[in-house]
C-alpha cells in the first residue's frame, strides 16, 4: 500500500476529460473518509447497545419537529463510545449529540468531521472547490471556492442551487449525504473579513454548522452568539418556512447559582447544597472539552401563519445534573417524558434511563467503558463478552449469539454470526465496509454488486442465479429496475431532481407536475388513465386541498403545531379533531355532532375509547406497553408474555386458554388451542417451514432453489404440486381430490399481468377431461383490467371514468347496467335493462346520511324500497320497508342480540344469546330451563334442535336430532355425518334415518380449496318399489374467477354470475341451457390452425405469443376491423386477412336469459329482475342468512346467500369458500384455516352480520359489506403455516402487505404499519401489519424481524382520515424524519393512502414513486367515525 492519493475528481483522464466517478481524497492504504462510528454496520442489541463498540446508544429521539420545508428538528442521540478525536461537548451534555453538533476540525495533516451521530470522519486536506466522498459513510465534503462543478458531476445540480457567496467562499465547507441535499453549511460565528480590512481577522481552526440549504434555494439559519459566555453557541434558529425559535442556553455557573438559591430558599434544611456538589465550572471529559453550556428550553418566537397565537410555554425543556449531564426532558405540557442516570465516577456514562410510565433500564460497564450487561426488570436482559474479533451476546433466557468481526473502528463489520440455535450465517464487505455478499445458514450465497464510488446497489444475484439490476442517473437517483423476469420499471426526474414520471413493471405511467420551482411538492399527478389530481399546499408543506380527477375537493385544517383539526369532504361530510396539551388525540366529532373520546395513561398508551353512546372499551398494558387485557361491554380478553415479549398464553372471554411455545430463534413451534388441539411446526436452517403436525396429520413442505414451494405431502401421500415458468411466475397447481386430478392453470401477458385462469378436472386413470372452465382477463391501454371474458360468454366490459370509478357494464357490447355517482363517487342511481340509463324498467336510487352512511335505497317499484336508521355509534338499528320494519338491538360489545319485526298486526322479537366468547346459547327468554352458560372449548355440543360431535381437529362430524327430555324415543331421529380430507375440507356428507341413508353427497376441490364439483345421491323408489339411493348422482360443476364463484353447471343448464368489481356482491345472472351452449361450441382460430397444421394429424403447438396474436386477429376479423399491425405481421408471414378469415368458424349466439341481482346492503340477493323489470324470483332472509320465504313461480335455481356463500340443499349448509357455514347456528362447522389470524373464536361468523361479512370463510370482515374484498389470485390461507410470501424487492413485499391491509385500515379507520425484512437469500418479506394499542398512529419500528433476518424497510397506512399531525394522502414530516434517520437502517418507507396510492420514500426522505396500486376509499368503504 503506497498511501498515495487515488484519483481526484478534478484530475484529467488520458483523453482529456474530468474523472467524475473517482473518489477524491481516498488514499490507497490510508483511512481517509472512514468514520470512528457510533454504530459501525448499524448493529444494535436489546434496548439498545452497540455490541461492536460495547457502547450504550440511543438513536435519535425527537423532541421538536414542526412541519415545513427544511424544518427545525431538535433531536438527541447518545453514545457512551469515546472517539479518539472528539468534538467539544454539546448543549445536551457529555455523550449526547444534537443535529447541529456538526464540527469540522481543520488540521495541517487533514480534516476531521465530527457529525451529530458521534462519528469522527477523517479526510485529507481539500483545495478550494475540491470535493471528497467517503464511501464507507456515504458522505460528501466540499470546500467552497468554485462557481460550478464539472458537467456530469454527482453534485453539479446541488452545487448550482447554492447562493454564489457560499459557493465562491474558500473559507466555507459543505457536507451532504445525498446528491439531492440538503447541504450542511460549515462556517464560523466570527465576523467575515471585509474587503476594506487591511489584515483579515484570523479564522478559527474549526468550522461549525451555520445553516442548511436545499436544492430549491431554501435555507435554515442558525444564529450563533459572536461574543460573551455563549460565544459560538446557537441561540436562535429560523427554519425554511420562516418560523423563528429562541434557544435558551445556560452556563454551569448560572445553573450552580440557581441551585444554591433554590437550596437556600428550600424549607428542607436537612440537605444543604455544598459548593462542591454543583461547581461553577466543569472539567473536560472523555467526550471532549466542556464549556458547561447547556440547552434549557426552546421557545417559538415567530410563526408567519399564526403570528398572534404563539405558545405561552416552551416547546421543550431540559434539566441537568450538577455534572452537566442531561437529567430529564419535559414536553410542551411540562410533562417529564425522559429521565437519565449516570455513573458518578465517569461523567456522561449512562447507567440507566426511563421513558414516562415505563420501567428503568440499567447498564453495567467494565473497566474499559464497554457495556457488559443491560438489565431489564420487565423483559430480556443481556450480557456481553468481548474477545479479540469476537463478541458473545447472551440473553436472560440463556440464548447465545456470537458475532465474529473483521476490521477496526468504523470499518468493523460482523462477518460471521452464530445464532442461538447453532446455525451460522456469513457476510462479506468491500474495502469501504459495504455489504457485498451474504451466505445463509444453508450455505447459499446472495451477492450485491455496488457502484464503486457511490455504493449504490447495481445488481443483486440470489442463490438460484436470478439477477435484479438497478440503474441510476448522475445524481445517484434510481432510474430503472430490471427484475429477474425481465420486466422493467422506470423513473424520470427534472433538473432539480424531482420525480416527473414513474412507469411500473406493467407499463402504466404516472406523471407529476410542479408549479413552484422552489418546492418538491407536486401540484398535480396524472395517472395512466389520464386522470389528473390537484394539490394545494400550505407554506409548511401541509395539504390544504386535494382535488380529484372529477374536480371534487377535500379540504384540511391544522393547528399551530401542525396537527390536523378538520377534514371537509364533498357532500357535507366533515370530521373535527381535538388534542390535549401533549398533542394526543382526545376526540373525534363528525358533522352530526357524534363524538368519540380517547384516554391515555402516563406512558401515552391508549387506555380507553368512549363511543358516542358512552360505552367504554378499556385496555391495560404491561410495563413495556404491550396490551395485557382488553375489556369491552364487561367482557375481557387477556394476553400473557414471556421475558422475550412473545405471547405465551391467550385467555378468552370464557376463561379458556390457548398456549404457545417458541424455539431459540423466536419461531412458533407449538400451539395449543382453546379446545386442546395441538399443532407443531419445524423449520429448516433458513427458517422455512418444512414440517407441520396437526394431531395425526404430518405435512412435509418442499421448495426449489428460489425458495418457492414446489410440493407437499400429507402422511407420506402426495398432495399439492406447484409449477413455475422461466420468469418465475406460477403457471400450474395440481393435486388429487377424491380420486380426480384437479389443476389450475394461469396465463400471463408479456407484462406479467394475469390474462387467464383455467380449472380442469381429469380422470387420473384414463386422462379423460371431465370439466374445464376458463376465465380471460384483458386490459385497456391505460392498464386497467376493464374486460373479463367468462367461460362461454361474451366479454364483460366495465365502463369507467377518471381513475377507474365504475360508470357502467356491457355484456358482449350490449349495455346492461349504468351508474350515476355523487361528488364522493358513491353510487346514487343504478339502472338496468335494455333501456338502462334512460327509461330503465329498473332504477335504484341510493341516498346517504351526512356522516356517509347508507340512508335509503328506493326503486321505481316500491316493493323493494328500504330506509336505514343508525345509532350514534354507527350501528344499524332499523331497516324499514313497505311491508315491515325490523329493529335491531346490540350488546355493549357490538354483537347483534335481538331483532324485532313490526308489521300490521305483527310484533315479534327474536333474541340471540351467546356465551362471553361468542358461541350461541339457548336464549333464556325462549328456554328458561336451560342451564348452559358457556362452551369452554368453543365447541357447541347441543342446542334446542340437535346434538353435535366433533373430532380431534374440532371438525363437526355428527349432528343428530335432539330428543327433548320426557319424549318417548321412536328411533326416527335423523343423523348427519360429515367426513373431511387432510385439509379439513368436507368431502362426504350423508343423512341417515332408521339406519338407511336418505341422501349422500361427495365434493371435489381444486388445490386452492375451491369446490369444483359435487355429486348427490338421493333416496328414491326403484323399479321394484324399494327405496334406495339413486344409482346415478346429480352432478354440479363449478367454475371460478379468483375467489368468486362465477359458474354453476348442472345436467341441464349453466348459470353464470358477474359480480360488482372488487366485491362479492352478485350483479348479473346469465342462464344458458346446455343444448344452446353445445350449438355455440366452436374452435378458436388458433385451435383450428394448431389442430389442422400437421400432415400426420397429430396437430402442432403454437408459442403463447402466437396464440395471443391469433386471438386478437380473430376478434378483429369478427368485428371487421383488422388493424394495420395485424396486417403487417400477416404480410411478413406471407398470409392475407382473407386466407385467415376463411379459417374462422362461424359463431352461433345461444339464447340466454339475463337477470339483475337486487341485493341488500350486504350483498345478499333479495330478487332477480328481468330486463323488462319483472321479478323472476324473490326471497326473504333473517339476519344470519336463513331463508324465511321464497317466491319462485319459474323454479329458478338461486343458490347464493350472504356474500361468498352458496346454499347446498342436500345438507342445509352454505359453502363459504374455505369452510361450510351453518346458518341455523350462525357459525362454521370447522375451525378457521387461518388460525388465530382470523379471530380468537375459530368457528365464529361475524357477530354483527348486518354490517360485517366473511365472504372467504376466513373471518376477514369488511364493514361495508357491498364494497370490497380481496378477490384476486390465491388467498393467503397457508400463510400462517408456510410463512410470508417473499419477493425480489422491498417495494413488492410492501405492496403485497399494503394490499392485504388497506381494506381493514380504511374500514376501521386505523393506521397500520409493519416492516420489510430481508432473509439470507436476499429475498424480502413483510411482517404482519399491526396497529399500536388501538392508536390512530402506528410506529413500524416497534416490529422486529425474525432472528437471522434484517430489517430493511417499513410500510404503513393512513386509515381513512388521519387523526394526528399528518396529511392523509402523503408522507408526514415525522414519516420523513423516520426514514432519514440512519440509526433505523431503512432503505425505503412505503405508504398506502386513502385515495388508493402506493407511495415510497428513499432513505433520504425523498419521494421515489407514487402510483395507484392499492384499494382506495371510494372503492372500499367510507367509515362514519374513527
Swiss-Prot record:
Native organism: Escherichia coli (strain K12)
Protein name, as recorded: Protein RhsD
Expression triggers: Repressed by H-NS, induced by LeuO. Part of the rhsD-ybbC operon.
Keywords: Repeat
Notes concerning its domains: Each rhs appears to consist of a highly conserved 141 kDa amino fragment followed by a highly divergent C-terminus.
Role: Rhs elements have a nonessential function. They may play an important role in the natural ecology of the cell.
Composition skew (Basic and acidic residues), residue ranges: 1073-1085
Similarity section: Belongs to the RHS family.
Low complexity composition bias: residue spans: 262-277
Keyword Repeat: yes
GO biological process: cellular response to sulfur starvation
Sequence repeats: 334-356, 357-378, 379-421, 422-442, 443-464, 465-485, 486-506, 507-529, 530-550, 551-571, 572-592, 593-613, 614-633, 634-654, 655-675, 676-695, 696-715, 716-738, 739-762, 812-832, 833-861, 862-882, 883-905, 906-941, 942-970, 971-995, 996-1030, 1173-1197
Sequence segments annotated as region (28 X approximate tandem repeats): 320-1197
The organism's taxonomic lineage, starting at the top: Bacteria, Pseudomonadati, Pseudomonadota, Gammaproteobacteria, Enterobacterales
Region Disordered, annotated ranges: 256-285, 1073-1097
Amino acid at each position: 500500500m503506497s498511501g498515495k492519493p487515488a484519483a481526484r475528481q478534478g484530475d484529467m483522464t488520458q483523453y482529456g476529460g474530468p474523472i467524475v466517478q473517482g473518489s477524491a481524497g481516498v488514499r490507497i492504504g490510508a483511512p481517509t473518509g472512514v468514520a470512528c462510528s457510533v454504530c459501525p454496520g448499524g448493529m444494535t442489541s436489546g434496548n439498545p447497545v452497540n455490541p461492536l463498540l460495547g457502547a450504550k446508544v440511543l438513536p435519535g429521539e425527537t423532541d421538536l419537529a414542526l412541519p415545513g420545508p427544511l424544518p427545525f428538528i431538535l433531536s438527541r442521540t447518545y453514545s457512551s463510545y469515546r472517539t479518539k478525536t472528539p468534538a467539544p461537548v454539546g448543549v445536551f451534555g457529555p455523550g449526547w449529540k444534537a443535529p447541529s453538533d456538526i464540527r469540522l476540525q481543520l488540521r495541517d495533516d487533514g480534516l476531521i468531521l465530527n457529525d451529530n451521530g458521534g462519528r469522527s470522519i477523517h479526510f485529507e486536506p481539500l483545495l478550494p472547490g475540491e470535493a471528497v466522498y467517503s464511501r464507507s459513510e456515504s458522505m460528501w465534503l466540499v470546500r467552497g471556492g468554485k462557481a460550478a462543478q464539472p458537467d456530469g458531476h454527482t453534485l453539479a445540480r446541488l452545487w448550482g442551487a447554492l447562493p454564489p457567496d457560499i459557493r465562491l467562499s474558500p473559507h466555507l465547507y459543505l457536507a451532504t449525504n445525498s446528491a439531492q441535499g440538503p447541504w450542511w453549511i460549515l462556517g464560523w460565528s466570527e465576523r467575515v473579513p471585509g474587503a476594506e480590512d487591511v489584515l483579515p481577522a484570523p479564522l478559527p481552526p474549526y468550522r461549525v454548522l451555520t445553516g442548511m440549504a436545499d436544492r430549491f434555494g431554501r435555507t435554515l439559519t442558525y444564529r450563533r452568539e459572536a461574543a460573551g459566555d455563549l460565544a459560538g453557541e446557537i441561540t436562535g434558529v429560523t427554519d425554511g418556512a420562516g418560523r423563528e425559535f429562541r434557544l435558551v442556553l445556560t452556563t454551569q455557573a448560572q445553573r450552580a447559582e440557581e441551585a444554591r438559591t433554590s437550596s437556600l430558599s428550600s424549607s428542607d434544611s436537612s440537605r444543604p447544597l455544598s459548593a462542591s456538589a454543583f461547581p461553577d465550572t466543569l472539567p473536560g471529559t472523555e467526550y471532549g472539552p466542556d464549556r458547561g453550556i447547556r440547552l434549557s428550553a426552546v421557545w417559538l418566537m415567530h410563526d408567519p401563519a399564526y403570528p398572534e397565537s404563539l405558545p405561552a410555554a416552551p416547546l421543550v425543556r431540559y434539566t441537568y445534573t450538577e455534572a452537566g449531564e442531561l437529567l430529564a426532558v419535559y414536553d410542551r405540557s411540562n410533562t417529564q417524558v425522559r429521565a437519565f442516570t449516570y455513573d458518578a465516577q465517569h461523567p456522561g456514562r449512562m447507567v440507566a434511563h426511563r421513558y414516562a410510565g415505563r420501567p428503568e433500564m440499567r447498564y453495567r460497564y467494565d473497566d474499559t467503558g464497554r457495556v457488559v450487561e443491560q438489565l431489564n426488570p420487565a423483559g430480556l436482559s443481556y450480557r456481553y463478552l468481548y474477545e479479540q474479533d469476537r463478541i458473545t451476546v447472551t440473553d436472560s433466557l440463556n440464548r447465545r449469539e456470537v458475532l465474529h468481526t473483521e476490521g477496526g473502528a468504523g470499518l468493523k463489520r460482523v462477518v460471521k454470526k452464530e445464532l442461538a440455535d447453532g446455525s451460522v450465517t456469513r457476510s462479506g464487505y468491500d474495502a469501504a465496509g459495504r455489504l457485498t455478499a451474504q451466505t445463509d445458514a444453508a450455505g447459499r450465497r446472495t451477492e450485491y454488486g455496488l457502484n464503486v464510488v457511490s455504493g449504490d446497489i447495481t445488481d443483486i444475484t440470489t442463490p438460484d442465479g436470478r439477477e435484479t439490476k438497478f440503474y441510476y442517473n448522475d445524481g445517484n437517483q434510481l432510474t430503472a429496475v430490471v427484475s429477474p423476469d425481465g420486466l422493467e420499471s422506470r423513473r424520470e426526474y427534472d433538473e432539480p431532481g424531482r420525480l416527473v414520471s414513474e412507469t411500473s413493471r406493467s407499463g402504466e405511467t404516472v406523471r407529476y407536475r410542479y408549479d413552484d420551482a422552489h418546492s418538491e411538492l407536486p401540484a398535480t399527478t396524472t395517472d395512466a388513465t389520464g386522470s389528473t389530481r390537484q394539490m394545494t399546499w400550505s407554506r409548511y408543506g401541509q395539504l390544504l386541498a386535494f382535488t380529484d380527477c372529477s374536480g371534487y375537493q377535500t379540504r384540511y385544517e391544522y393547528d399551530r403545531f401542525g396537527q390536523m383539526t378538520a377534514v371537509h369532504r364533498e357532500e357535507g361530510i366533515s370530521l373535527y379533531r381535538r388534542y390535549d396539551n401533549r398533542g394526543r388525540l382526545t376526540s373525534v366529532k363528525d358533522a352530526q355532532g357524534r363524538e368519540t373520546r380517547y384516554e391515555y395513561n402516563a406512558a401515552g398508551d391508549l387506555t380507553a375509547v368512549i363511543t358516542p353512546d358512552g360505552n367504554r372499551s378499556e385496555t391495560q398494558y404491561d410495563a413495556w406497553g404491550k396490551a395485557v387485557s382488553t375489556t369491552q361491554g364487561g367482557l375481557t380478553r387477556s394476553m400473557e408474555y414471556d421475558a422475550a415479549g412473545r405471547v405465551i398464553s391467550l385467555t378468552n372471554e370464557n376463561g379458556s386458554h390457548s398456549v404457545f411455545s417458541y424455539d431459540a430463534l423466536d419461531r412458533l413451534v407449538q400451539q395449543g388451542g382453546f379446545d386442546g388441539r395441538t399443532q407443531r411446526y419445524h423449520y429448516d436452517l433458513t427458517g422455512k417451514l418444512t414440517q407441520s403436525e396437526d394431531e395425526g396429520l404430518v405435512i412435509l413442505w418442499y421448495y426449489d432453489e428460489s425458495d418457492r414451494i414446489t410440493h407437499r405431502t400429507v402422511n407420506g401421500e402426495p398432495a399439492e404440486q406447484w409449477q413455475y415458468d422461466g420468469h418465475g411466475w406460477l403457471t400450474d397447481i395440481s393435486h388429487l381430490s377424491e380420486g380426480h386430478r384437479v389443476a389450475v392453470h394461469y396465463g400471463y401477458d408479456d407484462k406479467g399481468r394475469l390474462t387467464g385462469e383455467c380449472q380442469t378436472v381429469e380422470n387420473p386413470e384414463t386422462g379423460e377431461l371431465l370439466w374445464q372452465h376458463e376465465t380471460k382477463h384483458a386490459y385497456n391501454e391505460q392498464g386497467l383490467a376493464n374486460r373479463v371474458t367468462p367461460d362461454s360468454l361474451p366479454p364483460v366490459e366495465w365502463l369507467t371514468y377518471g381513475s377507474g370509478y365504475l360508470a357502467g357494464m356491457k355484456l358482449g357490447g350490449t349495455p346492461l347496467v349504468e351508474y350515476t355517482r355523487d361528488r364522493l363517487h358513491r353510487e346514487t342511481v343504478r339502472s338496468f335493462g335494455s333501456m338502462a340509463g334512460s327509461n330503465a324498467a329498473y332504477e335504484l336510487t341510493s341516498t346517504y346520511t351526512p356522516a356517509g352512511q347508507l340512508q335509503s335505497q328506493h326503486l321505481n317499484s316500491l316493493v323493494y324500497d328500504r330506509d336505514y336508521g343508525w345509532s350514534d355509534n354507527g350501528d344499524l338499528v332499523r331497516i324499514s320497508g313497505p311491508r315491515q320494519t325490523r329493529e335491531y338491538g346490540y350488546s355493549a360489545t357490538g354483537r347483534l342480540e335481538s331483532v324485532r319485526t313490526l308489521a300490521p298486526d305483527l310484533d315479534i322479537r327474536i333474541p340471540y344469546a351467546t356465551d362471553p366468547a361468542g358461541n350461541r346459547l339457548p336464549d333464556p327468554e325462549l328456554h328458561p330451563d336451560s342451564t348452559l352458560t358457556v362452551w369452554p372449548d368453543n365447541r357447541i355440543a347441543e342446542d334446542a334442535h340437535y346434538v353435535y360431535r366433533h373430532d380431534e381437529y374440532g371438525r363437526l362430524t355428527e349432528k343428530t336430532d335432539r330428543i327433548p327430555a320426557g319424549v318417548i324415543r321412536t328411533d326416527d331421529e335423523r343423523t348427519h355425518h360429515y367426513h373431511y380430507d387432510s385439509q379439513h375440507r368436507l368431502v362426504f356428507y350423508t343423512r341417515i334415518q332408521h339406519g338407511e341413508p336418505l341422501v349422500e353427497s361427495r365434493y371435489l376441490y381444486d388445490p386452492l380449496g375451491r369446490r369444483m364439483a359435487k355429486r348427490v345421491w338421493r333416496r328414491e323408489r326403484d323399479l321394484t318399489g324399494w327405496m334406495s339411493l339413486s344409482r346415478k348422482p346429480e352432478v354440479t360443476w363449478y367454475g371460478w374467477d379468483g375467489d368468486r364463484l362465477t359458474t354453476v353447471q348442472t345436467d341441464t343448464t349453466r348459470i353464470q354470475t358477474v359480480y360488482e368489481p372488487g366485491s362479492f356482491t352478485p350483479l348479473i345472472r346469465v342462464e344458458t341451457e346446455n343444448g344452446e351452449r353445445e350449438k355455440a361450441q366452436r374452435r378458436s382460430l388458433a385451435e383450428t390452425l394448431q389442430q389442422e397444421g400437421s400432415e400426420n394429424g397429430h396437430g402442432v403447438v403454437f408459442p403463447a405469443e402466437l396464440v395471443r396474436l391469433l386471438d386478437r386477429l380473430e376478434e378483429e376479423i369478427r368485428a371487421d376491423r383488422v388493424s394495420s399491425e395485424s396486417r403487417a405481421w400477416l404480410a411478413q408471414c406471407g398470409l392475407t386477412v382473407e386466407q385467415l378469415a376463411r379459417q374462422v368458424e362461424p359463431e352461433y349466439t345461444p339464447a340466454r336469459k339475463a337477470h339483475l341481482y337486487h341485493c341488500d346492503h350486504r350483498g345478499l340477493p333479495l330478487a332477480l329482475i328481468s330486463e323488462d323489470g319483472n321479478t323472476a324470483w324473490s326471497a326473504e332472509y333473517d339476519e344470519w342468512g336463513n331463508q324465511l320465504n321464497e317466491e319462485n313461480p319459474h323454479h329458478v335455481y338461486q343458490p347464493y346467500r350472504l356474500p361468498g356463500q352458496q346454499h347446498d340443499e342436500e345438507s342445509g349448509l352454505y359453502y363459504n369458500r374455505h369452510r361450510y357455514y351453518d346458518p341455523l347456528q350462525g357459525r362454521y362447522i370447522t375451525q378457521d384455516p387461518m388460525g388465530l389470524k382470523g379471530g380468537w373464536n375459530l368457528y365464529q361468523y361475524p357477530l354483527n352480520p348486518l354490517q360485517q361479512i366473511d365472504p372467504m370463510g376466513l373471518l376477514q370482515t369488511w364493514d361495508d359489506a357491498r364494497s370490497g374484498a380481496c378477490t384476486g389470485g390465491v388467498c393467503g390461507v397457508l400463510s400462517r403455516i408456510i410463512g410470508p410470501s417473499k419477493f425480489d424487492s422491498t417495494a413488492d413485499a410492501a405492496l403485497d402487505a399494503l394490499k392485504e391491509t388497506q381494506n381493514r385500515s380504511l374500514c376501521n379507520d386505523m393506521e397500520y404499519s409493519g416492516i420489510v425484512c430481508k432473509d439470507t437469500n436476499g429475498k424480502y418479506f413483510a411482517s404482519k401489519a399491526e396497529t399500536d394499542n388501538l392508536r390512530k398512529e402506528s410506529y413500524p419500528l416497534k416490529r422486529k424481524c425474525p432472528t437471522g433476518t434484517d430489517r430493511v424497510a417499513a410500510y404503513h397506512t393512513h386509515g381513512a382520515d388521519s387523526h394526528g399531525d399528518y396529511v392523509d394522502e402523503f408522507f408526514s414530516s415525522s414519516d420523513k424524519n423516520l426514514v432519514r434517520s440512519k440509526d433505523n437502517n431503512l432503505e425505503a418507507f412505503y405508504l398506502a393512502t386513502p385515495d388508493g396510492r402506493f407511495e415510497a420514500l428513499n432513505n433520504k426522505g425523498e419521494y421515489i414513486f407514487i402510483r395507484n396500486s392499492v384499494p382506495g376509499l371510494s372503492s372500499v368503504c367510507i367509515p362514519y367515525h374513527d
